[in-house]
């Protein structure tokens, strides 16, 4: 980028405060320029008497060089910085001893700038040192126009743009290593010339690659907004490479940049180890089981006992392999279940006590003894079962403690389930009259599941698990909490954190006066206007309370609630429709078979009739033939018979004649005797 800086020839000279009085006098003296320059390296001379270069063109001066008395080193002042940079003079030092070594190195730099047109020129002015040539005129001040691509050991080139070669820069350690390998020490680094034509990153005040001014990675807050002093040319938030920076000299150093100094450009903060991160998932709430997830919420009302019927109906419609149902119970709802369970247990205990009393009163009776033995056996079994249950709970608690001490996580996350049946002794919940496979939750479970920061939060997991939430029954207390946004229990916490893309059904159940209250209407209006994902069912008319009051405040019929749930979930499953179609097809096939059977039977009957007719015809023909034959035979027989009869008649006639003659003779003889 030296060609851009060389075009600005209208720059003024060095400020007067940077030069001594003698130097200003020498500059002010009038003299003609000398044109005896022999080459680009003519200014390099011995240590005692430095040779002043001659100028080859009368162009204006841009850079002025000052040599000290010893001639071992000089100071070069540049007053023509890159456009856009602050005009602050920069002083660098050079050593002529290293000129030849640097010239050899700089002949083949890794990032050599292409040769530019010879029409663009750069000027350098070398002024004689103070005390060596005090009386020298301006004609002794020689200028030189170097050819493009040539390097001078004692001149300072205008700094190249720090934004043009950002992708070719290295970090500070690689630059230091390169300098050390070329020059052989840190002293030569400080005295080396930074004016080579190689496109290295340079800045008037400091190294551009200084990590204190160019942080190489994103901040720990993951912010992509750069500081005002940092110019970033890339917009890729993932791969942020090193870029040149334009920084103020007075800007304070950031501790964040210092801490990020040793990190690579693409480095990422160390994440937590995977084995130490517990998956935010409760095993009792599987989300990828391919089932419909229905979450019921029950509050303290007498209609809470209809929950069992709704669960059974849904399972009958979908089947247990297609639907999964879980229940959230408030403290009031658990009290209703607990009171009912206690009544049942009290009746059982009373029956056992009465049986004991009867057995004791009828100790001599054999039947009484049998009852006593049976009751005693039952009592002993219950006692042993309670003892075994207590031992099992103790063992379970010990195992939980061991697991928590070894793994650091509660055992509830390891797959243990809390059921509503009495067989699970680990459960500390009151006995709930729900199916044994139904998982129910109470407020205490919120704290039993959560032990540390990485454990799942129950109401968040329930919100993620459920496809629909049905609060049935809904009391006025919970209604007010929902409308006002309170979340002081598990159910209201789930509703407060609910995803609006999933539906919520509310089935109110309260007294007539409570339902007709102004606050109740206000709460319903808030829910209707502000919560479009919530549907409030119309209550049913029924007798409320022991006083026989009839009001429109009872919970909707359980079958209607189930129907609305099924419709919201997409309608009745295709399995039942397929079964109905199969049944229709079976019925059609049976009808066809029946028709075919009846048609075959008719055809068989027709065939049989035809066969019978044919047989009859044949029989008739045969009969006719037989009859004819018989007739012929009969005729013959008749003829024969007639002949025989005739013969017989003749014989008979002859016999009769003989008899008549005999009689006559007898008569004659009798008469004669008489």
Swiss-Prot record:
Residues 137-150, 198-212, 592-602, 661-674 have a biased composition (Basic and acidic residues). Changing residue 459 to A: Does not strongly affect the phosphatase inhibitor function but abolishes PPCDC activity. Residues 214-230, 384-395 have a biased composition (Low complexity). It comes from the Eukaryota. Residues 15-81, 106-116, 152-164, 351-368, 403-426 have a biased composition (Polar residues). GO terms for molecular function: catalytic activity; FMN binding; identical protein binding; protein phosphatase inhibitor activity. The modification Phosphothreonine is found at residue 90. Gene3D superfamilies: Flavin prenyltransferase-like. Interacts with the C-terminal domain of PPZ1. Component of the phosphopantothenoylcysteine decarboxylase (PPCDC) complex, a heterotrimer composed of CAB3, SIS2 and VHS3. Component of the phosphopantothenoylcysteine decarboxylase (PPCDC) involved in the coenzyme A synthesis. Acts as an inhibitory subunit of protein phosphatase PPZ1, which is involved in many cellular processes such as G1-S transition or salt tolerance. This is Phosphopantothenoylcysteine decarboxylase subunit VHS3.
